[in-house]
Curated annotation (Swiss-Prot):
Family per similarity comment: Belongs to the ATPase C chain family.
Positions of the record's site feature: Reversibly protonated during proton transport: 83
Organism of provenance: Sulfurimonas denitrificans (strain ATCC 33889 / DSM 1251)
InterPro entries in UniProt: ATP_synth_csu_bac/chlpt (IPR005953), ATP_synth_F0_csu (IPR000454), ATP_synth_F0_csu_DDCD_BS (IPR020537), ATP_synth_F0_csu_sf (IPR038662), ATPase_proteolipid_c-like_dom (IPR002379), F/V-ATP_Csub_sf (IPR035921)
Function per UniProt: F(1)F(0) ATP synthase produces ATP from ADP in the presence of a proton or sodium gradient. F-type ATPases consist of two structural domains, F(1) containing the extramembraneous catalytic core and F(0) containing the membrane proton channel, linked together by a central stalk and a peripheral stalk. During catalysis, ATP synthesis in the catalytic domain of F(1) is coupled via a rotary mechanism of the central stalk subunits to proton translocation. Key component of the F(0) channel; it plays a direct role in translocation across the membrane. A homomeric c-ring of between 10-14 subunits forms the central stalk rotor element with the F(1) delta and epsilon subunits.
GO MF annotation, one: lipid binding
Domain of life according to the entry: Bacteria
Protein name as catalogued: ATP synthase subunit c
Keywords for this protein: ATP synthesis, Cell inner membrane, Cell membrane, CF(0), Hydrogen ion transport, Ion transport, Lipid-binding, Membrane, Transmembrane, Transmembrane helix, Transport
Pfam families, sorted: ATP-synt_C (PF00137)
Amino acid sequence: MKKILFLMVALATAALANDGDVANQTLKAYSMIAAGLGLGLAALGGAIGMGHTAAATIAGTARNPGLGAKLMTTMFIALAMIEAQVIYALVIALIALYANPYLG
């Protein structure tokens, strides 16, 4: 009876020894999915924001051509801020892919 119990404990230990690797593989897969979705949504939102900013600048310049230079400067500042958000999403995605603190 003791031999059977020892054998069952040994087999259970061997069977459960690989769970850490499976958990790491799953976490890597979820990290890739999250990075792709997060960066895709950030790029989509940034593109929509840039489009609205450019459209508003063009409409403002068409209404008052004298303010074209000021509107253009303001538009470039706004575009830089919008693009910074997408770059932040890229940095977070790269951290999730290559320097994931949960993988150990």
